[in-house]
Design a protein with these regions (language model features):
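Conserved N-terminal substructure of TIR/SEFIR domains
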Residues: 1-63, 146-161
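C-terminal interaction surface of TIR/SEFIR-family domains
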Residues: 1-7, 18, 103-161
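Conserved nucleotide-binding/hydrolysis micro-motifs of P-loop NTPases
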Residues: 13-15, 99-102
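Short, glycine/charged-enriched secondary-structure capping and boundary segments
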Residues: 21-24, 79-82, 107-109
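Short, low-complexity, polar/charged sequence segments that are solvent-exposed and flexible
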Residues: 26-29, 84-87, 113-114
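Conserved beta-strand termini and adjacent loop/short-helix elements that scaffold enzyme active sites
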Residues: 34-37, 95, 131
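Conserved beta-strand-loop-alpha-helix hinge of the TIR/SEFIR fold
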Residues: 57-86, 91-101
Length: 161
């Protein structure tokens, strides 16, 4: 099976180093991170520019992975990305990344599940996108060994299967 194209959603300032660990696993094909300078430039252009950037970068992706750090649930653009992914019929899942070690800050506290802030439906049926909490003793390998399976399950769920 070919690698799925993935859009990663996360809290840039707090979690970019942990996110890089996941991206560099090479298990799936993810979007390239935006540089801090580019992101600041996009933000200065306002809400519609941010939405356009997200929409453009999410296009062509089959799944959105929300990498959940300590404060991810507070980020309005993460919530926008989750809603957009679901509305577009993309696979959607979350992974707690608090036990991945950041080179600067080590690990962090487990964050609140941002999926609890949104109701997801297929037709009239309420569904719950899966949120994974990797083993605290070996989070990196747990994610690496299971990521492609988790992505396939999320894509299957979003299609109503």
């Amino acid at each position: 099976m070919s690698k799925r194209k993935i859009f990663y959603s996360f809290h840039f300032d707090n979690d970019v180093m942990r996110v890089q660990l996941v991206r560099n696993m090479g298990v799936i094909e993810g979007n390239e991170p935006v540089s801090p300078n580019t992101w600041e430039e996009i933000k200065r252009k306002g809400k519609s520019a941010i939405e356009k950037w997200i929409d453009d970068n999410m296009a062509g992706k089959s799944c959105v992975i929300v990498l959940i750090g300590e404060e991810t649930h507070k980020r309005p653009w993460v919530l926008y990305e989750m809603k957009k992914a679901w509305a577009d019929g993309k696979g959607l899942l979350g992974i707690h990344i608090h036990n991945l070690k950041c080179a600067r800050n080590g690990t962090c506290k487990k964050g609140v599940d941002p999926f609890s802030q949104i109701t997801f439906k297929i037709g009239e049926k309420i569904v719950f996108p899966k949120v994974y909490d990797p083993k605290p003793t070996d989070a990196y390998n747990d994610i690496s060994n299971n990521l492609s399976t988790w992505v396939e399950a999320a894509i299957k769920q979003s299609s109503g299967s």
